[in-house]
Design a protein with these regions (language model features):
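Auxiliary alpha/beta "docking" domains used to position bulky ligands
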Residues: 1-190, 229, 238-239
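A short, charged helix-loop
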Residues: 177-182, 216-225
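Conserved Radical SAM active-site core
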Residues: 251, 255, 259-286
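Long, compositionally biased charged/polar accessory segments in the mid-to-C-terminal portions
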Residues: 290-291, 298-316
């Protein structure tokens, strides 16, 4: 059954598939300490979901295991990207504003949920009565379950790192009551003495290995937060206008093993003029919704993208 499941997952475009048990999280105390420290910022939903994240067996009634799946989202053009602000626009000579690689195509929640839905249907066809898919949209501790399923380890940058392909991957799950044998956890920490991600973060968001202060993270500041970007941090954006890839880009596992995705939905649409610092300022709400309504850029909205773009442009100005 497991081999047939892996084969079907591969046919859908997933690069890895494993089965995780649903016993209580071993990171429960760490999650409580992280929330208590205020590292979650304004993401109050993390507090509301904490109890279930610590007890994944309670997320879906009747589920016995979680099928964990990985999608590669690295766009073809993204393989050559370097640090923020390094490229110049050929027309203006300005250094380009950056958009995180995962956000250059279609919204991954929608893309992955379509495939997860097909896999859930396959599980039902093979005897499951419970097959509930999650695409980063619930109280699921995805990275821990992926580690538990043997798909990789949690790196010092807090990302799941797959030995064969690095960390440019998205994690989806299907909770099911089908009697599948857990794959076996990947307990080996392959980060070793490397601290490149900690050293490269311009805002110091990785306060210690595997501990991220989201309130200092460029991705949080430009995606999740609705507040003005603090003056103390806005000058350190290094040109990032939506999200950030620095801690992924500098990871040796990505530099050596990451390969572009074959999935068309994640290829760079070229929808954003990264050389125009007033790109969103001139855009109407209707135009924004039409152009970005099915992309991750929809999350902060036009007001958020105007804030981000202005701050990113200022961060590239000579000091």
């Amino acid at each position: 059954m497991t081999r047939a499941l892996e084969a079907y997952a591969g046919s859908l475009g997933f690069i890895a598939c494993g089965v995780a048990s649903l016993e209580p999280s071993r990171y429960g105390d760490a999650l409580d300490a992280w929330l208590q420290a205020g590292y979650g910022g304004t993401m109050r939903y993390l507090h509301r979901r904490a109890a279930k994240r610590k007890r994944p067996q309670e997320i879906v009634a009747g589920a016995k295991v979680a099928v964990v799946l990985l999608e590669n989202y690295l766009p073809k053009a993204g393989r050559e990207d370097g640090k923020a602000g390094e490229r110049e626009d050929g027309r203006t000579g300005r250094r380009e504003i950056k958009v995180a690689k995962y956000a250059r195509g279609e919204d991954y929640h929608r893309v992955m949920m379509r495939r997860l839905g097909l896999l859930a249907g396959w599980l039902r066809e093979h005897g499951a009565t419970v097959a509930h898919p999650w695409a980063d949209d619930g109280p699921v501790p995805e990275r821990e379950l992926a580690q538990r399923a043997g798909l990789g380890w949690i790196g010092k940058n807090t990302m799941l790192i797959r030995p064969e392909s690095g960390s440019f991957c998205l994690i989806g799950t299907v909770f099911t009551d089908l009697a599948l044998t857990p794959s076996g956890a990947d307990e080996y920490d392959r980060c070793g003495s490397c601290t490149r991600c900690l050293e490269a973060c311009p805002t110091g968001a990785i306060v210690e290995p595997r501990v991220l202060d989201a309130t200092r993270c460029i991705s949080y500041l430009t995606i999740e937060s609705r507040l003005p970007i603090p003056d103390a941090l806005s000058g350190k954006l290094e040109g990032w206008g939506f999200g950030c890839d620095i801690c992924n880009d500098v990871c040796p596992w990505n530099q050596r093993f990451a390969k572009p995705t074959t999935l068309g939905e994640y290829q760079d649409r070229g929808a954003v003029d990264t050389g125009d610092p007033r790109f969103f300022e001139r855009m109407s709400e209707a135009h924004f919704a039409e152009r970005f309504g099915d992309t991750p850029l929809e999350r902060p909205g036009l007001a958020g993208m105007r804030r981000n773009w202005a701050a990113a442009a200022r961060s590239l100005e000579p000091r």
